[in-house]
Each structure stands twice: as C-alpha cells, then as structure tokens.
C-alpha cells in the first residue's frame, strides 16, 4: 500500500471550477494536498492542516486495490486542534489528465437522478506526490466489497451458489445500468474485481478510471459494449478454486448475467446495432459452454 503520511493541506480547489482543474493540479506543489470545494466546517481550507493515519483494515474486501490504493483516516486540524476525522481512499494516477478525468466521471455518476442509480465514491481532493504522480482522494465507505474478494474467500472450498448468483447479479445490474443511461458509459475493464456491492448487497461502483461516455448510435462504437459483456463473462468463467474446479459455472452465468441482459437488448440499442450485440452474445454463450 502507498504511504502518504506527512502531507499537509494547502491550495484549496473549488469543486465547481472543474474546467480549469487540470491546470490547477499541475500548479500544486509536490508533497501537497488540495481539497475540492469549501470545507463543511465553515473554516477556510487554507487555515486547516491534515494528518493521515494508515488504516490497512479498510482494505478488507478490496484485495486487488491494496497495492494501488491507500486507505487512511484523515484528521483535519485548525490551530493544532483536531476538528474531524474522515475515512479516505487515495489512488495514484500516472498523469494529472487521467486523475482529473476520473474526478469528472465520479462527479457525473453521482449527480445522476435515476431510480436505480448506482453510486461511486465521492472525490474530495487531490494529492501531488513527490514522485510526480497525482492521486485522487475520495470518501471511503466501509462495507463495500469487491466481487473478486468474495471469490477469494472460497478458493480452498467451493463458492456457494447464492454467492455465485450475487456476483453475477451484481455484474449484470451494474453493467446494465451504465449501458442503459441516456448518455451511456462503457466500463472498458469489466473484470469481477471492478464490480462490488454494499453490506445490503446493493451494487456499488468502485473503479471508474476507464469509464468512457460511448455513443451506442454509432456503429463504430458498438463493439465497446460487446467487449464489456465479453470481458465480464470471461472474468467470471475463468475463476477456479485451488482444486481447479470452476467457481461460476456457465449455466449460472447465462441465467443470471447473460439472459437478463439479452432480454433487454431491444431497449438498450437501436435496431441496426442490437443485432451486432445479439450475435456477440450468442458466440459468447457457445464459447463458455464449450469451455473456450
């Protein structure tokens, strides 16, 4: 896990100024943190200091995140007086451009008014690391578990059917939601490690870094939706326990992921592109049932 202790709070950035956010990030001195927007405590951000305390226990249920994402308790101080402690996740990016893009995506997802809205972690700030990387700070919500960590818990035995159904349902609900939006997103890395659920088994979006707003009316872009489906199905079907037994069998994947998606293709895509997705799905079902 990355370590960020010793970073101080400086240079507040206004959340509404997202169009100029990239330039402001590049101006942020290395080794400094900037929070987005005004502080809810009613104190100017420039009067605050921050202390980060590593919380390795927050990584439970997020195995594939721990090498890239740091989890912390962030305590805000004013004149050396502690005001509030908040759980944070801090994720590094190679460039400020990708960091800013992800912030914009997270904000857009969380602003959507939808009866089945799936939320993601709210971005709270940016850190400019000493090595030149830019890291995004977001709220951390305990109890969110990635699907791959659920699989890992049963590697030495067998994955119970109800757990396998939960994984397939979570993947379907998440992908279908983002594909069905008026301005849809493709995930572009739809492995089970990037699907998650809350303690109430409600789908939760944990990684938006590769999300792209994609035009389903454009035949040249329709393949991105098909690749999302394909990536997810192969990710599920490739999971095996320590004895080499398949943990999510093809019949379950078809019943709880492919079939419900397939039943709504006519609503998801225009007629001239729906057939492309349907053909892709038929080939996919044949592949996994034959053990390809």
How would you name each of these model-derived features?
Residues 2-57:
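Juxta-kinase regulatory segment immediately upstream of eukaryotic protein kinase catalytic domains
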Residues 172-179:
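Short C-lobe core helix of eukaryotic-like protein kinase catalytic domains
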Residues 95, 143, 193, 198, ...:
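Activation segment
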Residues 202-291:
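C-lobe/activation-segment region of protein kinase-like
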Residues 41-107:
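ATP-binding glycine-rich loop module of kinase domains
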Residues 88, 119, 136, 186, ...:
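Protein kinase-like catalytic core scaffold
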Residues 110, 118-167:
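Conserved structural core of kinase catalytic domains
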Residues 179-192, 197:
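Catalytic-loop of the protein kinase fold
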């Amino acid at each position: 896990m990355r370590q960020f202790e010793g970073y101080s709070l400086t240079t507040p950035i206004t959340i509404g100024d997202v169009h100029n956010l990239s330039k402001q990030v590049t101006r942020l001195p290395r080794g400094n943190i900037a929070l987005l927007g005004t502080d809810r405590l009613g104190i100017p951000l420039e009067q605050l200091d921050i202390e980060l305390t590593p919380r390795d226990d927050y990584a439970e249920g997020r195995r594939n995140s721990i090498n890239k994402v740091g989890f912390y308790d962030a305590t805000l101080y004013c004149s050396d007086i502690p005001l509030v402690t908040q759980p944070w996740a801090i994720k590094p990016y190679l460039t400020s451009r990708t960091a800013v893009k992800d912030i914009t995506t997270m904000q857009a997802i969380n602003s959507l008014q939808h009866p089945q809205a799936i939320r993601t972690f709210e971005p709270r700030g940016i850190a400019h690391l000493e090595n030149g990387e830019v890291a995004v700070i977001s709220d951390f919500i305990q109890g969110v578990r990635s699907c791959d960590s659920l699989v890992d818990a049963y590697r030495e035995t067998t994955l119970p059917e109800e757990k396998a159904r939960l994984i397939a349902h979570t993947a379907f609900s998440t992908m279908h939601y983002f594909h069905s939006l008026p301005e849809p997103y493709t995930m572009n890395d739809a492995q089970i490690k990037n699907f998650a659920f809350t303690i109430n088994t409600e789908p939760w979006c944990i990684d938006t870094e590769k999300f792209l707003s994609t035009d389903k009316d454009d035949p040249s872009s329709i393949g991105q939706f098909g690749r999302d489906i394909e990536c997810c199905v192969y990710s599920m079907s490739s999971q095996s326990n320590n004895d080499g037994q398949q943990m999510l069998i093809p019949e379950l994947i078809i019943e709880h992921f492919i079939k419900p998606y397939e039943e709504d293709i006519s609503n998801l895509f225009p007629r001239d592109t729906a057939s492309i997705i349907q053909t892709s799905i038929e080939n996919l079902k044949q592949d996994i049932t034959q053990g390809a």
